[in-house]
Amino acid sequence: MNFEGLDPGLAEFSPAMHSTLDPVLDAHLNPSLLQNVELDPEGVALEALPVQESVHIMEGVYSELHSVVAEVGVPVSVSHFDLQEEMLWVGSHGGHATSFFGPALERYSSFQVNGSDDIRQIQSLENGILFLTKNNLKYMARGGLIIFDYLLDESEDMHSLLLADNNTLLVGGLQNHVLEIDLNTVQETQKYAVETPGVTIMRQTNRFFFCGHTSGKVSLRDLRSFKVEHEFDAFSGSLSDFDVHGNLLAACGFSSRLTGLACDRFLKVYDLRMMRAITPLQVHVDPAFLRFIPTYTSRLAIISQSGQCQFCEPTGLANPADIFHVNPVGPLLMTFDVSASKQALAFGDSEGCVHLWTDSPEPSFNPYSRETEFALPCLVDSLPALDWSQDLLPLSLIPVPLTTDALLSDWPAANSAPAPRRAPPVDAEILRTMKKVGFIGYAPNPRTRLRNQIPYRLKESDHEFDNFSQVTESPTGREEEPLHTVSKKYRKVTIKYSKLGLEDFDFKHYNKTLFAGLEPHIPNAYCNCMIQVLYFLEPVRCLIQNHLCQKEFCLACELGFLFHMLDLSRGDPCQGSNFLRAFRTIPEASALGLILADSDEASGKGSLARLIQRWNRFILTQLHQDMQELEVPQAYRGAGGSFCSSGDSIIGQLFSCEMENCSLCRCGSETVRASSTLLFTLSYPEDKTGKNYDFAQVLKRSICLEQNTQAWCDSCEKYQPTIQTRNIRHLPDILVINCEVNSSKEADFWRLQAEVAFKIAVKKFGGEVKSKEFALADRKELRSPEGFLCCSSMEELKNVWLPFSIRMKMTKNKGLDVCNWADEHELSSLGTPSQWGPARAEEEHGVYVYDLMATVVHILDSRTGGSLVAHIKVGETYHQRKEGVTHQQWYLFNDFLIEPIDKYEAVQFDMNWKVPAILYYVKRNLNSRYNLNSKNPIEASVLLAEASLARKQRKTHTTFIPLMLNEMPQVGDLVGLDAEFVTLNEEEAELRSDGTKSTIKPSQMSVARITCVRGQGPNEGIPFIDDYISTQEQVVDYLTQYSGIKPGDLDAKISSKHLTTLKSTYLKLRFLIDIGVKFVGHGLQKDFRVINLMVPKDQVLDTVYLFHMPRKRMISLRFLAWYFLDLKIQGETHDSIEDARTALQLYRKYLELSKNGAEPESFHKVLKGLYEKGRKMDWKVPEPESQSSPKSKAGLRPGALGWVG
């Protein structure tokens, strides 16, 4: 057939498929169908099929109104009247869907639903249309846009669907079950078993679900449980159709005869009140379809496939006069449907034609239909012409594309200034008559001006806002606040997460050095800046890295592991998750208020400056205690190499300052008590006159503190006013100072002293005072070791009060002298004797020079809640290890943002947004005083067998064989690795206005199981580590489907697994990394990240990258195993032993296919075939025909060394 005016995309079919029926010979053919019809050898060409206006439609009697072609020559498989709009939907055997609007059947939309299978059921919903094919359920908008595409099992053969409620769908077919699908989540929620297979028709009332079976039975099922309540054995052959109305059920079908199945002309009618059959109804046509059409009576419409239609009452006799003919173009009618208003009937035939019969000339498909949305016509060609002869023609009439770039008409930033309009003053009459209730004031309207009338004031006359004109607009563009004063590099940095996580986040943009930053998203990561300060103290770093003990949550051990990661990193950020995990378990930290909730940390509640100063005191005390408790552990035989002996602490030698506290009562009694402290707190003078104080004066006053207080006197035997003084006996090697700028009082003191110091500097370098000493100082500063020119600009000395060096000397009468020190003092002392003596002989005279090494500052930012950053002077040894150069340099450390800075920036404190919190001064030539040799304290004994923490763990359940002494790994050995995780905190995300999802904070994962298998030798594939990690933290989600971890597996009281501590397993992996083994696994980058390990890239063989093409998707281990190894893994849950073995086999396969990397082109072809196969299968592994649920895949290979898991 050739239909003009139809969609050009419709398929053409051969003449053999067309009907051979001659329309002229058919007495029942509607003559109106012959209008504009030409018969030719190629088929029938219909220019227009609608009924002519002369056709008369009798009210109350059904007759044909229109006939249209849905798809040329392709049989109609299903028809459905839309329940929301005035539309008729038609599906074909070719998988094509077409919709027609209104009684005129105007084509509305046409699109392909399935490329190979026929459409078997259509259901209209509020926002779209559901289409059911053989094994696919597709939800599409009425215009053809796919909303979701739900693939069923390939073995399914679906025929019917039923909308149980607005969100639940039942789908049945030729199998022995019915699926329940949630339309909100698009997931299968239930699978109901049916005793009689083959559910091809489903109906529903307020009492039952009705299921029609291919065996000829109709079952009535409960609405809640879907259990069979009643069953009617309607036909002995098969069921053709049935319908339900009120208390009646009518069915038609086929009965078994000697020659086979024959159409039964008796309709079976059942009374649902008595649940029994009533008198069958004999009809005069061969019934294939039937529907109740309850208008005035409960009429039944019975349709035969040849086109005959009969109306009759279900409880009366059929009248032959009620038969009429539909006149299909093809030989058979294929579908039949009735509109919700009962005013229209739709028939679809085998030639793709749709016939609409109505009982009125202007029928309505639904009692209440909403308005249909039509595509807007293109308005581009209908734009009005512009008359260029008009002088006042606005250029805004010309449409231009929206752009975010700067426009030519934009004013330059230098010529722009924010000019806020001041609120007008409140009328004096209003203030006089105002009454207040609480904080709300109200007054009668004085009627002095009109509503919304405000006097306009020019900018020149508003002198009160002149200061704003001095603030230039932010140079970075319109998006930033123009009055924001915090420098960009000091602002709180955040990680932008995408659907790939961190893989596409550019950390190099924030850190162009080879030093490692720290990630900020972990709970209580506010201490990142202090971790960096401790790391860049060379003696502290060596001491911590040499420490190892048996204590599970030892901060010194965890800090040493973190320092090792910072050593290995080449600019990539690290995370202190394991250190902070141990930190959260210490009761003292919680008692001091150092453990912040996520909400408090995100909102910046509390003072971060006070918090980090308390943390500073806590960490030094805790490290001092951990070092004092050091004993040679039995489990870790390599832990004996420590700096200090038992009972002493190198932390004490570095930080501790011996003090002498003297209490003098007014009775003359004096009490002296010795003590020590690890840090000092600045105590500021109460002077409000604006007097100039050197930092050295304030520091001396804070160290040698003198105060009056009430104290107990043994002589007086009562509390008496006493004078308490503190004298120093021994100076520390590292001087730690908490600034305690916690109020505006201390901030004003810093601001005032900085202003006074700046005035002195301007006078000094401005030429008013120029002595020989200053000249020497200038020349010395020009050759400073940091490589910066001193005072190249006066701006560098603004807000500077802190000296870069101080000199301290013990006096003979237990006193202390402190002064600000600059290198010019040493030059002047060469020619003139000084009370301090030459610096080169400082130890002989008890004189020490301290150089500023780090400053920790609190950044005040109301938009982000503030943050903590550190300025650190990185020494030569660190530059030598990282960059191969020998020099010193100041750096800004702001989490993962690291940037070199000028040395003066480290001591500039604008108290409006940059407040000092902690200062670190170190003795000059500190590194030469200590042994800085560091060695790895982890030995091979950590891999030997160890006891499990689980009380119920039995040896028969062992899933691994520990390494023997002759199996110890060597450099380059292969080890298969896999890890499973649980979730501690759920992901925090927000939904943007455009519908996209933005991750604010990723989910916090914790390692739950780590497995290592042998990669070579006779025992290849047998695990030697299979540790379940005990956790004391609250687990939100065990992720059992993906991890195989069940509740109780990580609890030492009830677990039957081999349970260990995270530290124990971490040491095993650290030893393997340090010895130089190569790890083989799938997705190892995430595994090492959660375990908190830094592994050199040449020791990682990740199959997710080995079998990956650039700019293509990553392929799952399950699909790779099925494609290359013909293995089906990860059936119900994941098993780490199975995954690790599979990764090893895939690596062997990679070496085989790529000829050990020698033939990359041939391997590239293999990868192309892999991706083509994956796209065809939608990256899903076909399920086996009979899949048994795996009870335990964690055991050893049967027969391997006689072990069976």
From Swiss-Prot:
Domain USP: 485-924
Region (Disordered): 1179-1205
Annotated positions of the Phosphoserine modification: 784, 1189
Compartment(s): Cytoplasm, P-body; Nucleus
SUPFAM superfamilies: Cysteine proteinases, Ribonuclease H-like, WD40 repeat-like
Taxonomic superkingdom: Eukaryota
GO cellular component, one term: PAN complex
Protein name: PAN2-PAN3 deadenylation complex catalytic subunit Pan2
